[in-house]
Swiss-Prot record:
Gene3D superfamilies: Blc2-like (1.10.437.10). Belongs to the Bcl-2 family. It is a single-pass membrane protein. The lineage of its organism: Eukaryota, Metazoa, Chordata, Craniata, Vertebrata. It is found in: Membrane. InterPro entries: Bcl-2-like_sf (IPR036834), Bcl-2_BH1-3 (IPR046371), Bcl-2_fam (IPR026298), Bcl2-like (IPR002475). Disulfide bonds: none annotated. GO terms for biological process: apoptotic process; regulation of apoptotic process. This is Bcl-2-related ovarian killer protein homolog A. SMART domains: BCL. It comes from Danio rerio (Zebrafish). The chain crosses the membrane at residues 198-218. A motif (BH3) lies at residues 64-80.
């Protein structure tokens, strides 16, 4: 009986972990792991040798990482030239950590600046999964630029910036959706309208990114 009681207690504790909402700290930490995975994938695709992250994603987060990469591929396929040569588009010197972080955070803020509303959902400050994938695509492309030009240390700067932006601007939105695992609905849903909505938000994300680049360049003049 004692063993059964302990098993029940353990099972309850495990279920509590899965049922509870993720904390801001957990969401930020997971966002950085996902960013490392995304950057590693893009560096590998570009033919740049790069060691796999020591603390890579596992379990549910590994599935999220796979979906994020798949959606990133789809987004980049829609607009193949948008997420390349990001440093050149922004006209920044990637040798400076401050410039790289400032540019990334400025573009991120502009991507998510547009108000967004959809029937049945609350109005939120421009957050969609399409825009989040767009931000990761920017991070991956910028990291490739940095490493290619001899500044691999900037990868850590970009990852830290991603975590900072998630903490300040995306954590509450993610928490309302139960965490990062919600992104898997973009590919597992059998509702054609859901996938159609994803393609629309992804296409819009490209537009918001291009607008962000223009605003950043105008700000620098």
């Amino acid at each position: 009986m004692e063993m059964l009681r302990r098993s029940s207690v353990f099972a309850a504790e495990v279920m509590e972990v899965f049922d509870r909402s993720p904390t801001d700290k957990e969401l930020v930490s997971q966002s950085k792991v996902l960013c490392r995975d995304y950057i590693h994938s893009r560096l590998h695709r570009a033919g740049i040798g790069w060691s796999k992250p020591e603390h890579g994603s596992g379990g549910t987060l590994a599935e999220v990482s796979s979906v994020l990469l798949w959606l990133g591929d789809e987004l980049e396929y829609l607009r193949p030239n948008v997420y390349r040569n990001v440093a050149r588009q922004l006209n920044i010197t990637i040798a400076s950590e401050n410039i790289v972080s400032d540019a990334f955070l400025a573009v991120a803020a502009e991507i998510f600046s547009t108000e967004y509303s959809r029937k049945g959902l609350e109005k939120h400050k421009g957050v969609t999964w399409g825009k989040i994938v767009s931000l990761y695509a920017v991070a991956g492309a910028l990291a490739v630029d940095c490493v290619r030009n001899g500044h691999p240390a900037m990868v850590h700067t970009i990852v830290d910036c991603m975590g900072e932006f998630v903490r300040k601007s995306l954590a509450s939105w993610l928490k309302k959706r139960g965490g990062w695992a919600d992104i898997t609905k973009c590919v597992v849903s059998t509702d054609p309208s859901f996938h159609s909505h994803w393609l629309v938000t992804a296409a819009c994300a490209c537009g918001h990114y291009l607008k962000a680049v223009v605003f950043y360049l105008l700000r620098e003049k």
